Amino acid sequence: VGGNLKAQTIVKHQIGFDIRPGYVAPTNSFLEGDNARQKTIDQSLSLHLKYAFRFNKDSRLGRLYPHAYQGIGVSYNTFHSPAELGNPVVVYAFQGAPIVQLSPLLSFDYEWNFGASFGWKKYDGLYNPQNEVIGSKINAYINLGFILNWQLHPQWKLAAGVDFTHFSNGNTHYPNGGLNVIGGRVG
């Protein structure tokens, strides 16, 4: 019983780091250059630090979800316009798994992230009147990524892919155009 119980509780821990450059979709005139800098806001960069775990393959959950991983992450984001948008920090939960195993060392995976972003420069009628994209200092963060995952060594992976991100306050404050990013990721 002791050995079986031990197998039920052991998890595999992972630490990861992602760099995600992105293209900001021009959803309104503020992003197209109708802002204080009179320049398009069309680039983003985010740096992610993630902790993940997966269940032991011999546990009940490990047998149900043998390749799934889940965890928490934190990221720093810039849109190269700190005076009008800020440089938000995101805290999020994530989950991912292979969609298809392409070879013994290469898989095509998905990963979703969901959390809260803090540190935005929100719309202000006097001090930030052109920013109709972000209406609150705290916004939801939603991300979906598709990744090629290459197992370099039993302890090391290299991942590269594309992802789609949406920042929004869910219409709790206006204006709320939201911010959409289409990007790449390496980690």
Q: Which sequence ranges carry the predicted segments?
A:
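Short glycine/proline- and aromatic-enriched beta-strand/turn motifs that initiate or cap beta-hairpins
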Residues: 8-54, 187
